[in-house]
Amino acid sequence: MAVNWVDINVDGETMEGYLTQPAASGRHPAVVVIQEIWGVNSHIQSVTDRLPSQGYVGLAPALFHREGRMTLGLYEEMDTALARLGRCSDANILADVRAAVAYLKAQPNVDPQRIGIVGFCFGGRVSYQSVCNIPDLKAGVVFYGGRILQPLGGPGPAPVEQSAALSAPLLGLFGEEDGNPSPADVARIADELNRHHKTYEFHMYPGCGHGFHCDGRASYRHEAAKDAWAKTIAWFNTHLKG
């Protein structure tokens, strides 16, 4: 496996990205990995590191690049992370994801027709929003995406209000004890997807709260995380390799 930090052009600005690649030659499917509010920290890097062994190129773009490099891995810095999130906008986030997808499409070892996205927490929201706005994405996975029901950095629309435009199969993985998104939020999102006849699967994990996949958080639940990751790879295998 090859690992690098790369520079990605976003409208003339530089966004860092954590890139992992299989050792095998040829063109591979690729997955954009979207951070939690703490940036491309050790957890997000470890997720991206898992992809090459499954035959995928992985790329985790640093979405807070407009504010400079963020200290990585300090989960106690909630106020700092939330302040940065509050200064984000949906327009900038979509520009960043489009740039990450364009970067992958330009790589000689990536099949440009087989790119997916997975996101965690804030990144789950970004993943949902992205598959509603970027047709180049052929599969999406949302891990406990908060604030899907609200716009960010402007009057709207919220990601859930863009569900009619969702253009890729979507997998959602949620904790039954989570408050953001709550089970009621997840049900509302599912209702909207059903209303528009979209292809999706949602799984609710009993006894799990927010962040159950992240082994750096007290909310980590090993068995649920293991099962959710297996479902993630199976989803990508079906929709990016099938």
Regions found by a protein language model. Give the residues of each.
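N-terminal cap/leader regions of alpha/beta-hydrolase-fold enzymes
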Residues: M1-G242
